[in-house]
UniProtKB/Swiss-Prot annotation:
One of its GO terms (molecular function) is ATP binding. GO terms for biological process: ATP metabolic process; muscle filament sliding; skeletal muscle contraction. The keyword Cytoplasm applies. Residues 1-257 form a coiled coil. The rodlike tail sequence is highly repetitive, showing cycles of a 28-residue repeat pattern composed of 4 heptapeptides, characteristic for alpha-helical coiled coils. Its main location: cytoplasm. Muscle myosin is a hexameric protein that consists of 2 heavy chain subunits (MHC), 2 alkali light chain subunits (MLC) and 2 regulatory light chain subunits (MLC-2). This is Myosin-8. Keywords: Actin-binding, ATP-binding, Coiled coil, Cytoplasm, Motor protein, Muscle protein, Myosin, Nucleotide-binding, Phosphoprotein, Thick filament. The modification Phosphoserine is found at residues 33, 45, 58.
Length: 257
C-alpha cells in the first residue's frame, strides 16, 4: 500500500508538472498568436504605406514629365525668339544701311541742287545777254531734281519709320527672350525639386518594403514557433490525459484492496 501511495504521489507530481507545462505551452501559444496578429497588422500597414508611396512616386513622375515637357516647350520658344531677334537685328542692320545710303543720296542731291542753283544764277546773268532758252532748260532741270529730292526725302522718312518699328520689335523680342530664359530656369529648378522628392519617396518605399520583408520573416518564424507551441500543448494535453487515466486506475486498485 505504501508503494502505491508513493506511486500516486509521483503520478500527482508528474501530473502537476505536466499541467504546468501545458499551461506554459498554452500561454506561449497565446503570446505567439498575439505577436503574429501584431506583425500581420504592421505588415498590412506597411503594404498600404508602400502602395501609397508607389502611387505618389507615379504621380510625381507624371508631374516631372509634364514639367520637363513644359521646360522643353519654353526652351524651344526661347530659341525661336532668339532666332527671330537675330533676324530682326539683321533686318535692322539692312534698314540702317539703307537709311545711311539714302542719307548719302540726299546729301548728294542737295549738293547737286546747290550746284544747279549756282548755275541757274549764272544763267540769269546770261539771260540778261539773251540766254532765255538756256535758263528755261536749267529751271526745268532744277524742278526735276527738286522732285527727285522730295521723293528721296519721302523714301527716307519711310525707311526711318520702318527702322523705328524694327527697333521696337527687337526690344520686345529681347524682353520676351529674357522672360523665356527665366521661365526655363524656374522650370528646371522645379524639375530638380520634384526629382529629389521622387528619390525620397522611392527610398521610403524601399525602406517600407525592407521592413515588410523583415516583418514577414518574423511572422514566419513566429508561425513556426506557434506550430511548435501547439505541438507541445498537444503533447502535454496527451500526457495529462494519460496520467489522469493512470491515476484513476491506481485509485481503483487501491479501492479494490
Amino acid at each position: 500500500r505504501a508503494a502505491l501511495q508513493a506511486e500516486i504521489e509521483e503520478l500527482r507530481a508528474t501530473l502537476e508538472q505536466t499541467e504546468r507545462s501545458r499551461k506554459i505551452a498554452e500561454q506561449e501559444l497565446l503570446d505567439a498568436s498575439e505577436r503574429v496578429q501584431l506583425l500581420h497588422t504592421q505588415n498590412a500597414s506597411l503594404i498600404n504605406a508602400k502602395k501609397k508611396l508607389e502611387n505618389d512616386v507615379s504621380q510625381l513622375q507624371s508631374e516631372v514629365e509634364e514639367v520637363i515637357q513644359r521646360a522643353r516647350n519654353a526652351e524651344e520658344k526661347a530659341k525661336k525668339a532668339i532666332t527671330d531677334a537675330a533676324m530682326m537685328a539683321e533686318e535692322l542692320k539692312k534698314e540702317q544701311d539703307t537709311s545711311a545710303h539714302l542719307e548719302r543720296m540726299k546729301k548728294n542731291m542737295e549738293q547737286t541742287v546747290k550746284d544747279l542753283q549756282h548755275r541757274l544764277d549764272e544763267a540769269e546773268q546770261l539771260a540778261l545777254k539773251g540766254g532765255k532758252k538756256q535758263i528755261q532748260k536749267l529751271e526745268a532741270r532744277v524742278r526735276e531734281l527738286e522732285g527727285e529730292v522730295e521723293n528721296e526725302q519721302k523714301r527716307n522718312a519711310e525707311a526711318v519709320k520702318g527702322l523705328r518699328k524694327h527697333e521696337r520689335r527687337v526690344k520686345e523680342l529681347t524682353y520676351q527672350t529674357e522672360e523665356d530664359r527665366k521661365n526655363v530656369l524656374r522650370l528646371q529648378d522645379l524639375v530638380d525639386k520634384l526629382q529629389a522628392k521622387v528619390k525620397s519617396y522611392k527610398r521610403q518605399a524601399e525602406e517600407a518594403e525592407e521592413q515588410s520583408n523583415v516583418n514577414l520573416a518574423k511572422f514566419r518564424k513566429l508561425q513556426h514557433e506557434l506550430e511548435e507551441a501547439e505541438e507541445r500543448a498537444d503533447i502535454a494535453e496527451s500526457q495529462v490525459n494519460k496520467l489522469r487515466v493512470k491515476s484513476r486506475e491506481v485509485h481503483t486498485k487501491i479501492s479494490a484492496e
